């Protein structure tokens, strides 16, 4: 009989329907009050050929009845002992609990399996080393709101109040929305900010929205939490930073719905190159031209990529109204990509930008801009002359033309293209400092002297004449005669006076005749 009972209890097969109660009892397959019990498949039982239960459901029922024989049978069929204990706790069949107490190492393991709050608390009480704090933590973790409600007064006690923050964070981490709502309505949450940070990390918009309901409705209604407009905006701005950094457009819209500043959202989107967010907010909020330009300035400041700059420019049809402000940012932050984009769209701001660079920036940045946009030397020098940047002109010219003679030749050509006298004189002064700093070949000096005469550069010409007389003496006869002819033709009396003085020296030295002098003048000089 033992082997037959063992065979019937351990294997899966259908019992004959005509087995008597006595036979079933002998086989160990009779459940008092229910009838026959047999195993079907791997995880189910059939009771009285009619009711089908999972093995663990049957264990709960057997535990509730305190029927250890059936519990042992179901354990033989690979049931989970935890369910039997849960059933026994529910109906307080502690004799059955004691029977298996030694097999449970940690009573917390049973808690996720329990649906009934009272049974949940009874099970937790078996962990003798735990206290109310531990119970509340597990109640939050396994969504036992009724337990929190039961111990609300304890939570409001000053001794427990410090634990509210930890329970709140735990509820956020486990997405217990019902508990979070109750806590917001009933408990003084010290810092509600974790609900927002956790929602952003987990991309949980529902939790994020609940956070605002807790802060702006529940907690304010309790009189526990009141935000001034300034503090409210600081919080919303901080949230903008978090969600835009992760590109979470729905979260951005949620913040805007609760009073977030559109300009701040745009600023973060530009700074962090979140074009999808930028585009959506601009179009949804109908952002004005002036604001778009401010965002463009910010993009320039942050060296935004081409796509971001193009997007911003497209909103204003590539028409910049406040060019001055834009150029200030371009030069200040040495961010020239926007100028190139506008140039591609036939919006030429090169001259204006170069002027701003020459006026306000350093030699290195000016040189970089000239090279990047292939600016002609003549264009740069004319702008630099207008801004009176002599040191900058000399430095850039040294980069462009290493040979001093070549430098002077090119600068002389540019002088001839400058239409205003003060500009010509300014550049001639620079040419003269180059002459003074280097040793030029005689023929270059002679050409420079003629150039000075043509432009009535009296002081520089006088300086050059001294050099020529001291170093070449009578060999300069032809030059002086040529200069005299030019000065006479252009009616430059000061130049004529200087030349006449040196011609007099030549005449005294016998290096020049009266006839040669008279050929130059259109009238007769009595002094000769």
UniProtKB/Swiss-Prot annotation:
It comes from the Viruses. ANK repeats lie at residues 129-158, 261-290, 292-321, 322-352. Plays a role in virus cell tropism, and may be required for efficient virus replication in macrophages. Interferes with host NF-kappa-B promoter activity mediated by TLR8. Mechanistically, inhibits the phosphorylation and subsequent nuclear translocation of host NF-kappa-B RELA subunit downstream of TLR8. Promotes the expression of the autophagy-related protein host ULK1 to degrade host STING and inhibit the interferon response. Also inhibits JAK1- and JAK2-mediated signaling and thus negatively regulates the IFN-gamma signaling. Keywords: ANK repeat, Early protein, Host cytoplasm, Host-virus interaction, Inhibition of host innate immune response by virus, Inhibition of host interferon signaling pathway by virus, Inhibition of host JAK1 by virus, Interferon antiviral system evasion, Repeat, Viral immunoevasion. One of its GO terms (biological process) is symbiont-mediated suppression of host JAK-STAT cascade via inhibition of JAK1 activity. Its main location: host cell. The keyword Ubl conjugation does not apply. It holds the Pfam family DUF249. InterPro entries: MGF_505. Interacts with host STING1. Interacts with host JAK1; this interaction leads to JAK1 degradation. Interacts with host JAK2; this interaction leads to JAK2 degradation. Interacts with host RELA; this interaction inhibits NF-kappa-B promoter activity. This is Protein MGF 505-7R. The keyword Membrane does not apply. Belongs to the asfivirus MGF 505 family. It is found in: Host cytoplasm. GO terms for cellular component: host cell cytoplasm. Induction: Expressed in the early phase of the viral replicative cycle.
